[in-house]
């Protein structure tokens, strides 16, 4: 779908440009690409070190923003160096400490868990969702892209979360269903994870006549379902594809 080979050229040092140059322009093995990727990754690690101190200090508001930053920098590492180095594993372990759902504030609106994560979701492949599960979904995704999905910790947390969400799909907001799928569909054989099939089929029930999903950005929905070969996912992709193409910018981006 990319219409212009200069995709993201207006952000030459962004992780998206680095990723695009490496994947679509075949520059991943060149010294210049490697230098740019390592330079950006070094900045990510410095930002991770900074937020680790904030997380140690506590404080709900600061922690929420820090967790979003931690997830974002892990995503940027995935776009650039994509290596399970000691520092990347340390960052994953830090995020893992916050995957247990946080207590719901007493002031949460009746019938709502409360939007616990008010931090900036810009540049994150997730949707702001009510409830305490964002760190878990972000960790599932990040750990998977760094090759940890075959380990007992990942499999145990994915299964436990799938068992929680499966019987609740019909009453779970679309953003939370999407975030769960973002953390699991990236893994080969994800259909075997409890809740995955139910969540995909629930999104199909909510998809409107134009292919859009209320509560989920269309490019996020399209991208995550493209990782699945489930019949329901394929039908949803077919339904929205025409409109996804129509929404694309001249340079091939979608509003980034």
Task: Locate the predicted segments by residue.
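Preference for long, amphipathic alpha-helical scaffolds in soluble/luminal domains
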Residues: 1-256
């Amino acid at each position: 779908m990319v219409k212009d080979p200069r995709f993201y050229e207006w952000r030459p040092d962004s992780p998206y440009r680095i990723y695009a140059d490496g994947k679509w322009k075949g520059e991943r093995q060149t010294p210049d690409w490697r230098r740019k990727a390592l330079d950006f990754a070094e900045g990510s690690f410095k930002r991770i070190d900074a937020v680790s101190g904030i997380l140690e200090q506590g404080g709900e508001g600061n922690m929420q923003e820090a967790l979003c930053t931690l997830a974002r920098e892990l995503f940027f590492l995935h776009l650039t160096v994509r290596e399970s180095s000691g520092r990347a594993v340390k960052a994953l372990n830090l995020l893992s400490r916050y995957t247990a759902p946080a207590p719901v504030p007493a002031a949460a609106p009746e019938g709502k868990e409360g939007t616990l994560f008010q931090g900036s979701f810009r540049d994150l492949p997730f949707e702001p969702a009510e409830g305490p599960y964002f760190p878990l979904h972000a960790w599932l995704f990040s750990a998977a892209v760094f090759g940890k999905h075959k380990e007992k910790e990942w499999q145990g947390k994915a299964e436990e979360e799938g068992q929680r969400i499966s019987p609740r799909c019909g009453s779970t907001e679309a953003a939370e269903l999407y975030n769960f799928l973002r953390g699991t569909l990236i893994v080969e054989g994800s259909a075997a994870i409890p809740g995955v099939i139910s969540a995909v089929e629930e999104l199909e029930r909510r998809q409107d006549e134009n292919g859009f999903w209320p509560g989920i950005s269309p490019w996020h929905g399209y991208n995550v379902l493209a990782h699945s070969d489930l019949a329901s996912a394929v039908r949803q992709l077919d339904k929205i594809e025409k409109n996804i193409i129509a929404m694309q910018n001249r340079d091939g981006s979608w509003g980034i």
